[in-house]
């Protein structure tokens, strides 16, 4: 027989889902069913919480305590960059492997780096900024009209100043 369910125990479940959509509740069921939650209700709550991230793949952190689920959106660097591009949401079923050919400012990159700082492995903010610039390169957008890798080279050579914190 399984151990008795402790009401004060906190369980954390991470899920990848598309923002603003009720994902497949069948994928939720094996993860949160044993914890005494209704997958359908949690799926609707996730869709509500991720409304701002329509059409983007994001990670959702479910903190479950005493049969209550708290939903926290944990956006990836690429999701933050694509959101900063302010492109209209696309139907992801029609188009696959989209290149985002937009342009964002270096200040927005710094803001994204500050948001991601706690999850970054870099020692300083300049390292995190370089990580975000690398992600911007993979997404396919430009920064201040230039290729992101050129800006990384400028940071390394000292031509571009990074904020200290």
From Swiss-Prot:
Per the record, the similarity remark reads:
Belongs to the universal ribosomal protein uL11 family.
Task: Enter cross-link residues for Glycyl lysine isopeptide (Lys-Gly) (interchain with G-Cter in SUMO2).
Answer: 40
Q: Annotated cross-link Glycyl lysine isopeptide (Lys-Gly) (interchain with G-Cter in ubiquitin) - which positions?
A: 48, 83
Record localization = Cytoplasm
Species the sequence originates in: Homo sapiens (Human)
What is any one GO biological process for this UniProt entry? Answer: cytoplasmic translation
UniProt subunit comment = Component of the large ribosomal subunit. Mature ribosomes consist of a small (40S) and a large (60S) subunit. The 40S subunit contains about 33 different proteins and 1 molecule of RNA (18S). The 60S subunit contains about 49 different proteins and 3 molecules of RNA (28S, 5.8S and 5S).
Q: Does the keyword Ribonucleoprotein apply?
A: yes
| Keyword list, A-Z | Acetylation, Cytoplasm, Isopeptide bond, Phosphoprotein, Ribonucleoprotein, Ribosomal protein, RNA-binding, Ubl conjugation
Its Gene Ontology cellular component terms are: cytoplasm; cytosol; cytosolic large ribosomal subunit; cytosolic ribosome; extracellular exosome; focal adhesion; membrane; postsynaptic density
Q: Its Gene Ontology molecular function terms?
A: large ribosomal subunit rRNA binding; RNA binding; structural constituent of ribosome
State the function annotated in the UniProt record: Component of the large ribosomal subunit. The ribosome is a large ribonucleoprotein complex responsible for the synthesis of proteins in the cell. Binds directly to 26S ribosomal RNA.
Q: Which residues carry this modification: N6-acetyllysine?
A: 54
Identification of the protein by name: Large ribosomal subunit protein uL11
Q: Which InterPro entries match?
A: Ribosomal_uL11, Ribosomal_uL11_C, Ribosomal_uL11_C_sf, Ribosomal_uL11_CS, Ribosomal_uL11_N, Ribosomal_uL11_N_sf
> Which Pfam families does the record cross-reference, listed alphabetically?
Ribosomal_L11, Ribosomal_L11_N
Provide the positions where the record notes the PTM Phosphoserine.
Answer: 38, 165
Q: Which gene encodes it?
A: RPL12
Write down the SUPFAM superfamilies for this protein, in alphabetical order: Ribosomal L11/L12e N-terminal domain, Ribosomal protein L11, C-terminal domain
- Provide the record's note on post-translational modification: Ubiquitinated at Lys-48 and Lys-83 by RNF14 and RNF25 in response to ribosome collisions (ribosome stalling).
Question: Per its UniProt record, what CDD domains does this chain match?
Answer: Ribosomal_L11 (cd00349)
């Amino acid at each position: 027989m399984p151990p008795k369910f402790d009401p004060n125990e906190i369980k954390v479940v991470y899920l990848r889902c598309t923002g603003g959509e009720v994902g497949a509740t069948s994928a939720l069921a094996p993860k949160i069913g044993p914890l005494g939650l209704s997958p359908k209700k949690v799926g609707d709550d996730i869709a509500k919480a991720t409304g701002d991230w329509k059409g983007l793949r994001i990670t959702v952190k479910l903190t479950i305590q005493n049969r209550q689920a708290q939903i926290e959106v944990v956006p990836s660097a690429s999701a933050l960059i694509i959101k900063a591009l302010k492109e209209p949401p696309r139907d992801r079923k029609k188009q696959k492997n989209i290149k985002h050919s937009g342009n964002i400012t270096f200040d927005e990159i710094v803001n994204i780096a500050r948001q991601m700082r706690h999850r970054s492995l870099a020692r300083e903010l300049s390292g995190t900024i370089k990580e975000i610039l690398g992600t911007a390169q993979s997404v396919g957008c430009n920064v201040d009209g230039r290729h992101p890798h050129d800006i990384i080279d400028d940071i390394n050579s000292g031509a571009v100043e990074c904020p200290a914190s």
